[in-house]
Amino acid sequence: RQRQMCIRDRQLLNRQQELSISKSSAIGNVRIIDPAVTQPQPVKPKKALNVVLGFILGLFISVGAVLARAMLRRGVEAPEQLEEHGISVYATIPMSEWLDKRTRLRKKNLFSNQQRHRTKNIPFLAVDNPADSAVEAVRALRTSLHFAMMETENNILMITGATPDSGKTFVSSTLAAVIAQSDQKVLFIDADLRRGYSHNLFTVSNEHGLSEYLAGKDELNKVIQHFGKGGFDVITRGQVPPNPSELLMRDRMRQLLEWANDHYDLVIVDTPPMLAVSDAAVVGRSVGTSLLVARFLSLIHI
């Protein structure tokens, strides 16, 4: 029996060797036809195509947004829109490219470390560039107002706007300078006790102004300053009070306007926007003429 087991083991070993030899000598049926080719560029994303499509899509979206804004924003586009509602238009004042360029340059200089840019070299169009088309339009406004104010009860002119940044201070200050150039005595009162900036425009002190006078802290001789560059007198707004409307309702405001009416050929009062606060309505009770400044496309369509 032991001999049989030895014979069987020998047969298994022989069979294993035969299989190993057969496996080593077997020829496979797989062969390489072409070597693999590597692609140096990515298949996706296609950057050039995406950039072109993105540019075209962005262009369409931008044009659509501009058209939608133009259609939804209904503002005053022409004087005829106001005249159709019985509102008299005294002048149309174009934007001054000269002033706009220098204003943008000064805003850049505000970030400079040089303090002089904050208080000096502020352009005043009526004096620095009197031949500008905007100044010529204000001269036409002066002529129109001269005839319009001939039958009014006093020579006090209130200039206001419908909304902030309507250009009322530009119109009022330029008008004051233009009228002063015709040898008339003019007083400019900055009654915008919240955001008035005439002291920066005229480069005068704002320590003693209208708010101090109305509060009883200062007298008239202390708050009236002369703006030599423009040739007229100025009352700045003073320090910002906590109750502007209440100050303007005091008798001292009425007394100031009555005194100014007797001592000046024209009194120009620059007030806050009439749709924002009630200050303009308060001052309007004591003036003979009111002028509303409507900026192009900024006033909601009537």
Give the residues covered by each predicted segment:
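Conserved catalytic-core segment of NTP-binding enzymes
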Residues: 73-83, 203, 215, 225-228, ...
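Soluble periplasmic/extracytoplasmic beta-strand elements of cell-envelope proteins
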Residues: 30-34, 90-92, 156-158, 233-236
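Short boundary/hinge segments that flank catalytic cores
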Residues: 52-185, 191-211, 222, 241-245, ...
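Non-transmembrane alpha-helical coiled-coil
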Residues: 1-4, 8-35, 40, 79
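Membrane-interface helix-start motif
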Residues: 38-51
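Hydrophobic anchor at the start of a short beta-strand
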Residues: 89-90, 186, 267, 290
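Residue-level signature of catalytic and energy-coupling elements of molecular machines
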Residues: 12, 32, 82, 141, ...
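Conserved helix-loop functional segments at active or binding sites
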Residues: 14-22, 143-151, 266
